């Protein structure tokens, strides 16, 4: 039996690296597209890499870019994938306000380029296509919780670009018979999450503060409510969506909601820190109420370690996101296995280990840059 061949865009990111691991364990030959830069930026997949001169190499990287249609067509022609997972994107909401045109080129037109390459190469009957969509499509939410039929109301250039990608995926499915589907992903995290995303900013920042590398964590909207899951659970669902008889779009979520404030509190407790939130709005702060154990030697009772900086507010806020994963459970039998508490514990432990290493370097006179935007 021939191995299935998968092509992943965004393979060096959080989801791409977990998906690559998952598919390799299932016996796939996995190809990934990465952008060329002066740095390799492959740390999330380095453990999967093998010398291409060896026999039976099942993991291969290709230089490519979602803004280059000829490049994408060449890679697809060479790889002839059974499954394409489009996880590559400019995925930071705040950055999309600063670089809206680039975000549209990558996230919207990049998806079109992949679908058109599949059509142009005559792969419409061979290749299945998964599009990583986003809960940001719901934006100014029209109903709670959000499900597959909830109307979209995007509130950022990122979300608008992703809405085009969502509909062009459906259009190519209906127009050309491509097995193409959207996974509407709610927030999903892990120790591999980018350091500028809110959850990783929190766990990394709290660990750094605990070790004396930072004084205070500056945040935006503490009242924002999100549905957070673990990326490992979500990439399994992405794979399951391409194993069905017919393509269908699904919400991928936990169905449970927490505030940014609660995520901060949970992260602090993993370090033995009890916080008290005082003040309101831009004047809200988190004060250390007690410290237990040895994980936070640099912190004392009364320290202010979290504050609000209005610079981190979005031009158009998304106040609440809560997904309804009941269709995925009913049709595919998918349920998330990792709880938020387990995920927070894993993320804090990983960031604490790094912070302790940086603190040791600093103690011995080395310069350590731990700034978080």
UniProtKB/Swiss-Prot annotation:
Supply the Gene3D superfamilies for this chain: NAD(P)-binding Rossmann-like Domain, UDP-galactose 4-epimerase, domain 1
Q: What is its EC number?
A: 4.2.1.47
Record-stated family: Belongs to the NAD(P)-dependent epimerase/dehydratase family. GDP-mannose 4,6-dehydratase subfamily.
This chain's function reads:
Catalyzes the conversion of GDP-D-mannose to GDP-4-dehydro-6-deoxy-D-mannose.
The keyword RNA-binding is assigned to this record: no
MF terms (GO), sorted A to Z? GDP-mannose 4,6-dehydratase activity; NADP+ binding
Q: What is the designated name of this protein?
A: GDP-mannose 4,6-dehydratase
Query: Which pairs of positions does the record mark as disulfide bonds?
Result: none
GO annotation terms (biological process): 'de novo' GDP-L-fucose biosynthetic process
Catalytic center at which residues?
134, 136 (nucleophile), 158 (nucleophile)
Q: Which reaction does it catalyse?
A: GDP-alpha-D-mannose = GDP-4-dehydro-alpha-D-rhamnose + H2O
Its needed co-factors are:
NADP(+)
Q: Which InterPro entries match?
A: GDP_Man_deHydtase (IPR006368), NAD(P)-bd_dom (IPR016040), NAD(P)-bd_dom_sf (IPR036291)
User: What is its EC class?
Assistant: lyase
Arranged from A to Z, the UniProt key words for this protein are: Lyase, NADP
Organism for this UniProt entry? Vibrio cholerae serotype O1 (strain ATCC 39315 / El Tor Inaba N16961)
For the ligand (NADP(+)), the binding residues are 10-15, 65-66, 87-91, 102, 162, 188, 193
